[in-house]
Every structure is written in C-alpha cells, then in structure tokens.
Amino acid sequence: MRRKTEIYSVELNGTKDVELADQKDDKKFKGGKNKDSEPNKSQEEELKKELDLDDHRLSNTDLEQKYGTNIIQGLSSIRAAELLARDGPNALTPPKQTPEIIKFLKQMVGGFSILLWIGAALCWIAYVIQYVSSTASLDNVYLGAILVLVVILTGIFAYYQEAKSTNIMASFSKMIPQQALVIRDAEKKIIPAEQLVVGDVVEIKGGDQIPADIRLVFSQGCKVDNSSLTGESEPQARSTEFTHENPLETKNIGFYSTTCLEGTATGIVINTGDRTIIGRIASLASGVGSEKTPIAIEIEHFVHIVAAVAVSVGVIFFITAVCMKYYVLDAIIFLISIIVANVPEGLLATVTVTLSLTAKRMAKKNCLVKNLEAVETLGSTSIICSDKTGTLTQNRMTVAHLWFDNQIFVADTSENQTKQAFDQSSGTWASLSKIITLCNRAEFRPGQESVPIMKRVVVGDASETALLKFSEVILGDVMDIRKRNHKVAEIPFNSTNKFQLSIHETEDPNDKRFLMVMKGAPERILEKCSTIMINGQEQPLDKSSADAFHTAYMELGGLGERVLGFCHLYLPADKFPQSYTFDVDSINFPTSNLCFVGLLSMIDPPRSTVPDAVSKCRSAGIKVIMVTGDHPITAKAIAKSVGIISANNETVEDIAKRRNIAVEQVNKREAKAAVVTGMELKDMTPEQLDELLINYQEIVFARTSPQQKLIIVEGCQRQDAVVAVTGDGVNDSPALKKADIGIAMGIAGSDAAKNAADMVLLDDNFASIVTGVEEGRLIFDNLKKTIAYTLTKNIAELCPFLIYIVAGLPLPIGTITILFIDLGTDIIPSIALAYEKAESDIMNRKPRHKKKDRLVNKQLAIYSYLHIGLMQALGGFLVYFTVYAQQGFWPTSLINLRVSWETDDINDLEDSYGQEWTRYQRKYLEWTGSTAFFVAIMVQQIADLIIRKTRRNSIFQQGLFRNKVIWVGIISQIIVALVLSYGLGSVTALSFTMLRAQYWFVAVPHAILIWVYDEMRKLFIRLYPGSWWDKNMYY
C-alpha cells in the first residue's frame, strides 16, 4: 500500500524532514511587511504544490506507468510534442523586464527632476502672466526651456549609465544553448534542453548540467554539485536508492541546473521549467519586493526641504508685496521668481554624474553596480549577511594539516601554496605522499602546462582536486608518477564502504610486489590497520598509537576540517605474482592488517584579504553575520579564522566545554558570540530572533535554508539596519532582492542571483564589499559637501529679489544671470567634489542611521543658508553698491527707486550728484551691477569650494592640491566668468557687460573671511568633540 504523499519545504541543508505544516507561521517572520514584499497567498499555495512529490518512493515500473514512458525506449516523438505543447518549454520564466521607455521616463521624473519640471512650468506661467499684462520678457521662456533641457540631458545620461550596467549583466548569460542526451523512439538523440518534457529518459555524465528535475533509474559512480541550490560545493553521491522521506534529500533525485561532477546516470524527467525546485525558488524571489534605496529617500527628503523653503519664502514675500500695494500680478511674478531662485538647477546633473563616477571607480575595483543609487546604499550598510563559500573563502578545498610521525604539521593554504614548511625528509612522508598521489582519480585537463598549478582545471570532485594540486606542487608531475606506478585495480569511494582503494605496480624494477593504497574516513581506515608507520618504520598499532590518532583526529575535526586517513600494504609477491588478476567485485585480496601512515585534513580556506576586511567592518561599526548552509563546526572555524568571531569571544558551547558542564547550564548572556543552526532558527519566534540579533554582536547561522536567509534579512531590517546580503546560488535570490543591497558573485553566481542583486562582485571577494562600503560612505560625504556648496549661493541669489521687493532697489541680479551661476560657473566645481578623497575618520565612524543621519540635516541647512550664505550675500551687495556709488548713486538714493528706474518713459532720472540718466544708460548700469554681483558670488564660491573639501579636518590636513579636479573647477569658474563678461558682454540679451578690473577684487576679503571662519569652525569641532559646537556646527 502506497504511503500518503507528504509536502516538504525547501530546507535544503537541514538534517531532518521539515514539513510545511511547521512553516505555516512563515508570515510571522516577515516582520509585517507590505503585501508587495512577499508572494501572495495563492502564489504560495501554488509553490507548495510544486513539491508535492512521491516519485522518489516509486519503483521503476510504477514510475514508467505514472509518466507513460519506457526506460529502454523513452517517449515517442509524437507524445513528446504533445507534452511540450501542454507544459511549455523547459526553461525558467525570465523575470519581468521593465520596458526601456518606462526606465527612461523614470529618470525624467524622479527626485530632483520633479523640482526642475515645476520650476520650468512656473517660468512659463510667469511669462503668460507678464504677456497678459503687456510687460512680457522672454527671460522666463529661456529659463523654463533651459530647465527642461537640464532634466532631459541628465535623464539621458543616467539612463545611459544604467543601460550600460544592464548590458554587462546580459553578457553574463550563457550564450550557448544547453543540449540534452535523450532517448526517444528507442533512439538516443541530442536535443535542446528546452524541449525536454516530463517522462523523457535522459542520460548524463561527468561535466553535464542536469537539464531538468529527474528521478534516477541507473547510476554508476554519479556525484553532483548542488551548490546552485545549497550554496555549498561538497559533492553529493547520487544513486537509484530511495534513502530519505524528504524528496530534497533522497539520493535518487537530480535537480535542474545542478552539475554532474563524475560518473554516469540515467533518469526520467519528473519536472520541467518553473515546476522544478530551482523554478520554485526563482518564483519566491520574484514575489519579494525591492525597497526604496536610502539615497532615493534622502533626495526625496532634500526636495521636500528645498520646496518647503522656496514656497514658504515665496508666499511670505508674496503677502509682503501685496501689503506694500504692489499689483497682484507683479506679486505673483515675485513669488515665481523667488521659488525658481531657490531651485538648485545644477544639482540634478551633479548628483547623477557623482553617482556615475563612483560606479566607474567601483567597477575598477571589481564591483559592478547595476543601479546607481545602490552605490550610496552600500555606504549606509550597518549589517552584512555574508555567504561563506567563495565569498569569505577561496571556494576550493585545500590541504590544511597533516598528521604523521605523531605530529600535526600545518600546510600552506595561501592562493599559490608555495611555502610548505613541514618536514619532507621523513620516510613516513615519502609513503604518505605516494598514497595521496596514487589513491586519487582526479586529473588535470590536458594542454594546461603553462597555467599555474593552482589555477588549472581539474576533472574530479573538490577533495580529490585539492589532493591532486597539493601533490603536484610538492612532488612535481603527478601524471608521470602515476604512469610509473601503473594502476591495475580500483574500488572507488562509496557511502557504504567510506574508503577508496587502488592497487599499483611499483616503479622500482627490483621490487615485484604490488602496492595497495587506501584512503577514507579515518575511523574506517584505522579499523583496517594492525600497524602504524613512525619515522619510516612499521610498528604495531598499540593503544598509545591509537590514542594519539584519536587526539589528532578530534583536534583537526574540531577545526571544522574534513579529515581523511591513509594506509597502504605491500602485497607479498609469492601470493600475488605479476600475472595475478585482481577482482574488485569478489575482492580476492586482503583489505585488513594494513599499515596506517597518516591523516590529512582539508578546508576551503579564507581568502587572505578577508580578516583585514572584517576588521575594517568592525572599526566602521558594521556587524558581519555569516549565513551558510555548511556544518556549524566548519562555519565556526572559518568565522574565527577571519575574525567574524573574535579570538577572545566565546559561544555558549565554548563556555560549556571550558567549564566541562552541559550547554543548558550556561547563562546565554555570558556568551559574546552565537552559532545558530537552521533547525534552531526554525523553532524561533520573530521576537526570539530579534533578541538574538540585538544581544549578540558576533553571529554565525549554519545549515540555513533559502527561506531562513530571507527571515534573517527581515529580522535585521526590523532593527532599522541597512542590510547588505551576499549570495551566489538561486537559493540566495529571495534574500538578495529583499535586502537593502543585494550583492551577487560574478564568477560563481547563478543568473538568478545576478538578476536579483543590486551589485555584482566580479572577483567574488568579500574585501571588495568593504572597498564598496568606503566608496559608498565617501559618496554620501561628497554629496553632502556638494549640496552644502550648491545651497550656499542660493541665499546670495535670493536676497537680491527680496531687497528688490522690500526696499525697491534696481534689480541686483536677474534670473538669466542666476542660471549662468547654477549651470555655468558651478557645475564643474560641484562635480569636482565627487573626486575628493576620504577624510581620515571615514571608516572609523558608525554607519549612518537611515532615519536620523540625513543627507541634508538642520546643521547643513543653517550653516549653508545663514552662515556662509549670508556672508556671500553681503559680499555681493558690497560690490553692487560699490558699482552704483562710483557711477553717482549712493546706497540711500537707491531705496524705493525701482518704479522710476524701470519706467521706460523717464529719460532724465537724477543720481546723487544731479546727473541725468536715460532709460538705456540706467539699463546698462543695471547690467554692470548684475555682472559685478555675479562675479562677487563666483569669487566667494571659490572659497566655498575649497572649504567644502572637508567637514571636520583642516584643509591643510586634507591637502590643498590632492584633488586636482577642484583646481580644474576653479579655473573653469574664472574662464566662464571672463567669457561672459568680456567675450559676451556686448550681447544685451544675456544682461552682461565688460567690468572694470577693480570690481573683480572687491569681494576677495569676504572670500578670505569665509575660509578663516570655516577653519575656526572645524578647529573647535576637533578640539571639543561632543560639545554644543560639535553637535550644532558639524553637518
């Protein structure tokens, strides 16, 4: 009687069955997120159905009957075509792509762009109002058109940058369509894998990618790499046996997109496309919504501030103008002019270029940014949830320790392994190295003689590859050694025997004996031995030798390393002459009373750059959490070696071991670090997970499933953390998408992971993330400096309008002139600040709090507007009044002169000396005053640019000339001003005139005052950290 089908969750690394009944509270873990951020209920139910499997329990006959197929003959072509039409192609549905036009339009209307569109609309409204009242000037039409042009050009630039990253992403995709060897109509055929259907009989061999979910009906030495599902690369044996109730853990199922490492197998396709396990996880990722980036939130916040300031000031002065008996239409024009004067027209272009420059800089450092705004998000990161394999480690098994002659020796685990320091003169090492070399099926692919050993491609599993490369580095040409010691018989490793054995002729022409070499699980190998080799001599395997073995085995195993035992036996020539035929099925040779030679342990070692990178994270206040599918002991060992768990910090288990008491007796609060398994996490409530994340600074999650990685990310986000997640497998894609910034691996990463991520590490190196964090913090700092620089002149541009309205002076500076400041003299200097090097404390600060540490905070606004801004305005008016006074108009005579000044019919207006001025002469003087005001702002902006190089350090600590682009910006300011004044001074439509040389220097004392004032501000901040001055003057 067939058992009732059970439904299992994708707990891929768990050690026990996990029923979905236990996962009903999944939503509780989601932290109350909005509906868009998780799959809807019907979708979840559908995803559950996809795992409604009992195929692993069925006999071959039942399986043939269920799918209407035949193991020998396969499906008929006609039936296959029917199934293909019914189920669709065997491919994952690609993620929904945003149409290019929508991407382009988003660039046109996001953030600053809205402000500029409103500004342009207001300019045109002002022109219409003036036109109706018959006083129309084309200035506002030009201004509106230029604002629209700025939006379009910066939008095109941002779209181009994003499209470039998208194209690089597309190039990751496999260009060659995958093929599958299928039996149809009793013939073997090679067809595109997309055309496979359920019931097809497929054959796979070492090196092939499994083309669909298959139930194995034949297997010979088949091992698969499930890393695209589990994230871990330990080879998994595959057979035809039903070994586990959970279909995800039984050995007779092969999963779509996993790789067959060695051996051969035949299987019946049981799921295709989106119905495969990989398809299910990809569907889970597509249901997870992306959150707004922190920089997008900050820009939105800044737009609100600027809009609020602009509208508030505009309305106040609109009311003032009406109260002062101005015409309502004039008051509306004033309102619009004040709002437009507050809009930082050049800032949109500056921010876009700054993000692009940083993205390019990061690409050079192996970080490909898909979304420009993700650059800054990385800088805000407060928690990094990092995968272990390939990110923190080198993604290759490496020999770490050896034990022979009763000693543990340390092997070189660096990238090239050229510094092996252990004793190689011992006779025991000679025997051990021979076993390591001969008892190994891995081989180098031919034609790689010129490639460094550690980079050569090997056919074989991860452990065998490690042993092969280790032998090649120390002994030389392994393939030549094997030729000289010809293999005559072999028993491959299997999970039942837990050993691998081979028999060889020896290279010594005088020794006619066969050499049998064996490796495997240390306890199994020791059972087969009666002697042990010490210093090249065989000795009886007594209790003291066995105890020494167990001590070494426990020590190496406790380091999280995979330990193998090695032994050999010379077969006597009289019983086993050279003509002897060895039978590996009936085993007609001894497999006991062997000589134990030594132990060897392997680990996927940490990358050499990771400990320093983790240390930098700790200095920067970033918590690094390891999330892996690997064994807790291995995970903890790697965490300790890279500094995720500090040398002095203990887990509950460490304290229990040290005190020799049960784990339950230890007060959890005593432990500073925690290692949590997937099974423990499954039983935690969200509140317990929150408590864990709050109370422990050093955490390792081991044996976790894809859903659990998602739960961990959401738990971190509940603590108001900005979370970065690394991953490479399809299993990681839901968490990558949910994180504030998802980081996929460029080399080992699956396409699904790269699609879900915001950034791709081209070198798969954790240290590149830390580089990215520094770049992200730097861009936030530099954007702050850019905004502070840009906002400062707003007051100097706004005050002339206010004085014009309130005091009735001739207009000190016009809207077109303001535009030349915002888009002419200030653009290149603003961009130059993006090249500014980091201040010394950038990686010693805590991560910024996304709700408290704003891009534009109160301190920045007050300092820019009311401190430096007012100084600039005073400097501008000083030059303005100097120009008018030298021409005969004393400052007092200009008050309430506006109406007479602007009346076209008055051509005999008297100045303070009784001289008469025509309308044209007055207009020319107004242009001169406006040009002088423009130059005054430009001169003071040079000082403002220099002081913005730092926020805390002195300019002299930072270096005046380290950022050469700043000086390019300063020179560009001066050149633009010179061209406008002397080159285009005769073009009356631009409102510029040729200035006397003396007017260029009137504002210089104000520029020096700005510099000195800011240096004093920074000095007091450094001298009195935490004081009122620090809290209110550091922006």
Curated annotation (Swiss-Prot):
Disruption phenotype: Mice are born at the expected Mendelian rate. Mg(2+) binds at D728, D732. The active site is at D387. PROSITE patterns: ATPASE_E1_E2. Residues 22-49 are annotated as: Disordered. Its main location: membrane. It catalyses: K(+)(out) + ATP + H2O + H(+)(in) = K(+)(in) + ADP + phosphate + 2 H(+)(out); K(+)(out) + Na(+)(in) + ATP + H2O = K(+)(in) + Na(+)(out) + ADP + phosphate + H(+). The modification Phosphoserine is found at S954. The keyword ATP-binding applies. It is a multi-pass membrane protein. Pfam families: Cation_ATPase (PF13246), Cation_ATPase_C (PF00689), Cation_ATPase_N (PF00690), E1-E2_ATPase (PF00122), Hydrolase (PF00702). GO terms for biological process: potassium ion homeostasis; regulation of pH. Coiled coil: none annotated. One of its GO terms (molecular function) is P-type sodium:potassium-exchanging transporter activity. Residues 121-142, 320-331, 804-813, 878-929, 983-997 are lumenal. GO terms for cellular component: actin cytoskeleton; apical plasma membrane; basolateral plasma membrane; cytosol. Found in skin, kidney and distal colon. The chain crosses the membrane at residues 100-120, 143-163, 300-319, 332-349, 784-803, 814-834, 855-877, 930-949, 964-982, 998-1018. CDD domains: P-type_ATPase_Na-K_like. Residues 1-99, 164-299, 350-783, 835-854, 950-963, 1019-1035 are cytoplasmic. SMART domains: Cation_ATPase_N (SM00831). PANTHER family: POTASSIUM-TRANSPORTING ATPASE ALPHA CHAIN 2, SODIUM/POTASSIUM-TRANSPORTING ATPASE SUBUNIT ALPHA. Belongs to the cation transport ATPase (P-type) (TC 3.A.3) family. Type IIC subfamily. The catalytic subunit of a H(+)/K(+) ATPase and/or Na(+)/K(+) ATPase pump which transports K(+) ions in exchange for Na(+) and/or H(+) ions across the apical membrane of epithelial cells. Uses ATP as an energy source to pump K(+) ions into the cell while transporting Na(+) and/or H(+) ions to the extracellular compartment. Involved in the maintenance of electrolyte homeostasis through K(+) ion absorption in kidney and colon. In the airway epithelium, may play a primary role in mucus acidification regulating its viscosity and clearance. The ATPase pump is composed of a catalytic alpha subunit and an auxiliary non-catalytic beta subunit. The alpha subunit pairs with the beta subunit of gastric H(+)/K(+) ATPase ATP4B or the beta subunit of Na(+)/K(+) ATPases ATP1B1 and ATP1B3; this interaction is required for the formation of a functionally active pump and its targeting at the plasma membrane. This is Potassium-transporting ATPase alpha chain 2. It comes from Mus musculus (Mouse). The lineage of its organism: Eukaryota, Metazoa, Chordata, Craniata, Vertebrata.
